């Protein structure tokens, strides 16, 4: 019995030692893997750079009805998403949420903060090659002020807007309003396309369903029914080669 006891005890001691050796090797291998992965990640961040390839397809899924592509009537998330891709504004918000000039090059105000003068960037064009200028801005604001247009924008009736020149427009407020620049994020429409369209008919006009002339990073190629009953829409867009943002 004593011999058997010594034999079993010796085997158990050896087995315990083997387990400790295996555990040590597992720990060592794990540490090597972690160190190697860390070195690879640091190397990747230091010596590689993310680049973008030309071409390809951009897809975006959004919820909500798509009844219009006219940005002045955009109400659902789908309509607003399409508007941001098709139309430029005087100002927009960048990825960090800061207000940034889009079509606008600069803005100046008087000491009383009742006059704001916006200067447009030079060389702006619509997707058909026609110049985009301050007359388009004034035309759009007049639509916002016109109750017959029934747009989704309000609060412009008390603001006086005048052209200074082809690339400059002045806004005169009845009282000081320091954050006025944040009101200049509305999309601009082309006067040379819509000037003869009555404001009361703009919502139902062909342009509102198929805006063939735009100013954003994309131009419309096709609006397609995604289902047989027309409840889902697919908007096909192509890059706008005349987009001022490149």
Feature-to-residue mapping (PLM):
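Ser/Thr/Pro/Gly-rich low-complexity linker/stalk segments immediately outside membranes or between
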Residues: 41-60
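Short, well-ordered beta-strand elements
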Residues: 54-67, 105, 115-118, 137-140, ...
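Aromatic- and charge-enriched surface segment that lines or borders ligand/interaction sites
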Residues: 1-4, 106-150, 162-164, 170-172
